[in-house]
């Protein structure tokens, strides 16, 4: 069973994914190649969200499905993969059509801001980028394109695991 987690920045996507990694899943990333390009070609040393967003979007201008095609190919070769960076409607839809379990994690602005402040010294840069399409489009993913919708918070892991246990039995 392959799982894709969608949500805004600081919503807890990586926390959910890491929980699955502890249970034997392998984490892969739609943005992994973007980060690799940013490090190799732009000497990015610490997370530069605007740079990553620009690289990702420019590649999507060349071929809109570039990142999702890469992940679908991995999913055809491996099972028990988890992705924690689904951001776009087409990504969620294509992954679900390919048999992936798609989970959307919602977060309120106040909690999102608190988490960014606690995570990044330059949290304002991240907060100011919340109007980027990679942040806004995730909330346009239709309910029919997700298998499970969760609210960010202490119960999210337990709710996710209960759902996945039910699916696997």
Sequence positions of predicted segments:
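P-loop (Walker A) phosphate-binding loop of NTP-binding proteins
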Residues: 8
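Conserved lysine of the Walker
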Residues: 13
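ATP-dependent NMP and nucleoside kinases share a basic, alpha-helical "lid"
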Residues: 26, 72-119
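Small-molecule kinase domains that catalyze NTP-dependent phosphoryl transfer to phosphate-bearing small molecules
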Residues: 66, 105-169
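Hydrophobic positions on the alpha1 helix immediately C-terminal to the Walker A/P-loop
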Residues: 16
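Active-site signature of alpha/beta-hydrolase-fold catalytic machinery across serine-
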Residues: 19
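ATP-dependent small-molecule kinase phosphotransfer cores
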Residues: 26-80, 87-90
């Amino acid at each position: 069973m392959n799982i894709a987690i969608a949500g805004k920045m600081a919503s807890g996507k990586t926390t959910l994914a890491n929980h699955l990694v502890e249970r034997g899943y392998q984490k892969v990333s739609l943005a992994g190649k973007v980060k690799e390009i940013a490090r190799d070609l732009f000497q990015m040393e610490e997370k530069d969200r605007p740079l990553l967003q620009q690289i990702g979007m420019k590649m999507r201008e060349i071929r809109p499905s570039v990142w999702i095609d890469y992940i679908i190919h991995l999913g055809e070769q491996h099972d028990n993969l988890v992705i924690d960076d689904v951001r776009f409607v087409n990504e969620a839809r294509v992954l679900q059509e390919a048999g992936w379990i798609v989970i959307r994690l919602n977060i309120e602005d106040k909690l999102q801001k608190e988490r960014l402040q606690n995570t990044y010294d330059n949290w304002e840069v991240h907060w100011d980028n919340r109007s980027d399409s990679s942040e806004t489009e995730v909330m346009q993913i239709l309910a029919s394109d997700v298998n499970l919708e969760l609210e960010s918070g202490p119960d999210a892991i337990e709710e996710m695991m209960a759902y996945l246990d039910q699916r696997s039995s």
